Amino acid sequence: MAKRVAEKELTDRNWDEEDEVEEMGTFSVASEEVMKNRAVKKAKRRNIGFESDSGGAFKGFKGLVVPSGGGGFSGFGGGSGGKPLEGLTNGNSTDSATPFSSAKTAAEPKAAFGSFAVNGPTTLVDKKISSPKCNSSNQPPSSGPASSTSCTGNTYHKQLAGLNCSVRDWIVKHVNTNPLCDLTPIFKDYERYLATIEKQLENGGSSSSERQTDRATAAMEPPSLFGSTKLQQDSPFSFHGNKAEDTSEKLEFTAEKKSDAAQGATSASFNFGKKIESSVLGSLSSGSLTGFSFSPGNSSLFGKDAAQSKAASSPFSAKASESQAGGSSSECRDGEEEESDEPPKVVVTEVKEEDAFYSKKCKLFYKKDNEFKEKGVGTLHLKPTATQKTQLLVRADTNLGNILLNVLIPPNMPCTRTGKNNVLIVCVPNPPLDEKQPTLPVTMLIRVKTSEDADELHKILLQKKDV
């Protein structure tokens, strides 16, 4: 649909006139019969072809495929059909059928976990492992009632299952975030945590069934964050940047502190930083932060104050970011206020004619080929001369004040009143319009704003012509 053309031409003569008030129409609702005949187009979803599972660049990659028999660690006895890890030893024993290993051999750390699934089950904590065998080099003597031995075995199994689930979740999260991360330090931590659990089993820690339920619940919560403070040059992630602290302090795996010490050894939970972000790991500075970061409100897994570790491990300042954001927004608001929708106004300095006795704004036309063509817009001045004649001068309304017409009014100059607000004269133009015929008289038309101005100008020209 084309735009509506202007009904009235806007010029310098009618720019200050008020427009006629137009009545605004109303929209009418089409009837049902009209709507039935109209074609209504509806958007259709484009069929985007997805790449099949059998093709693609990663068709041969089967490392993260969930096995049909269930997820989790394949060598940790998750189900009845699970097979133990082959070739693993617990230090002193050579039995390959033992489902758990302390991974004392650090030459092949990646074989300690086997293959794992991305979406493995998280209910491994609640499963009870039927075998009461403990993975320790020195088996504790079975001196006591059978119920105490069974309770101790269940506690050990739940703690070990919680440790394995935490290791699995941590590896899956960080490998998905960055497949090139270095996983070597986590195996050393796993050995230390496993040795701590075996030490608790040797001490004969026991608890009631209610404490077992609380412990299983606490194992699913993230009480600590396994963070990093030093970014190595050859790997994206590092877990032991401060070696001096590792040698000076023995990191002991402690339980959640309660009122009595008997309950404290059974509420341990293993978590390798479920909530830590990869961007935080990548941006930590070296030497100023602690080796681990912990969540507030819970005691640290390594015997440190959680509040202090949280304050020391926060690499960013919330107040600083808020102040910077507020400053940038205020600067944007100030910039918007300074900018205005109005275009810059062009200031025109009019050239004054001090000795003129008559001045009037006009538009000058000249006749060529039986039609009038515009010469320009300016100010008409009538000035007396030394020869008792009157000078007619028209200067353009520009900063330069170019001369559009500069002639003397001779006695025989034709001067007539024509139209509504026009005065017609015939003269030899100066400056000349045609360089080839500079002395040829040309009909000039002077248009003023109102008819009264035209009458006044015509009267003055007739008076000065007769002088």
Curated annotation (Swiss-Prot):
Sequence repeats: 76-77, 113-114, 226-227, 272-273, 302-303
Expressing tissues: Highly expressed in testis, intermediate levels in kidney, liver, spleen and low basal levels in somatic cells. Expression in testis undergoes changes and subcellular localization during germ cell differentiation.
Extent of Low complexity compositional bias: 313-330
Gene Ontology process terms (BP): mRNA transport; neural tube formation; protein import into nucleus
Keywords: Acetylation, Isopeptide bond, Membrane, mRNA transport, Nuclear pore complex, Nucleus, Phosphoprotein, Protein transport, Repeat, Translocation, Transport, Ubl conjugation
Classification via InterPro entries: NUP2/50/61, PH-like_dom_sf, Ran_bind_dom, RanBP1-like
Residues with N6-acetyllysine modification: K8, K83, K127, K449
Biased composition (Polar residues): 89-103, 132-151, 226-236
Pfam families in the cross-refs: NUP50, Ran_BP1
Entry keyword annotation includes Transport: yes
Annotated segments matching region Binding to CDKN1B: 144-206
Residues annotated as domain RanBD1: 334-467
Membrane topology (UniProt): Peripheral membrane protein
Region spans: Disordered: 1-20, 84-103, 129-151, 201-248, 313-348
Compositional bias annotation for Basic and acidic residues: 1-14
Region listing for 5 X 2 AA repeats of F-G, in residue ranges: 76-303
Positions bearing Phosphoserine: S52, S209, S235, S269, S295
Cystine pairings recorded for this chain: none
SUPFAM superfamilies: PH domain-like
GO cellular component: nuclear envelope; nuclear membrane; nuclear pore
Places the protein is found: Nucleus, Nuclear pore complex; Nucleus membrane
Per UniProt, location of the Glycyl lysine isopeptide (Lys-Gly) (interchain with G-Cter in SUMO2) cross-link in this chain: K352
Subunit structure: Does not interact with TPR. Interacts with Importin alpha-2, Importin beta, Importin beta-2, NUP153, Ran binding protein 7, CDKN1B and itself.
Function description: Component of the nuclear pore complex that has a direct role in nuclear protein import. Actively displaces NLSs from importin-alpha, and facilitates disassembly of the importin-alpha:beta-cargo complex and importin recycling. Interacts with regulatory proteins of cell cycle progression including CDKN1B. This interaction is required for correct intracellular transport and degradation of CDKN1B.
Domain notes: Contains FG repeats. FG repeats are interaction sites for karyopherins (importins, exportins) and form probably an affinity gradient, guiding the transport proteins unidirectionally with their cargo through the NPC. FG repeat regions are highly flexible and lack ordered secondary structure. The overall conservation of FG repeats regarding exact sequence, spacing, and repeat unit length is limited.
Protein's UniProt name: Nuclear pore complex protein Nup50
Species per Swiss-Prot/TrEMBL record: Rattus norvegicus
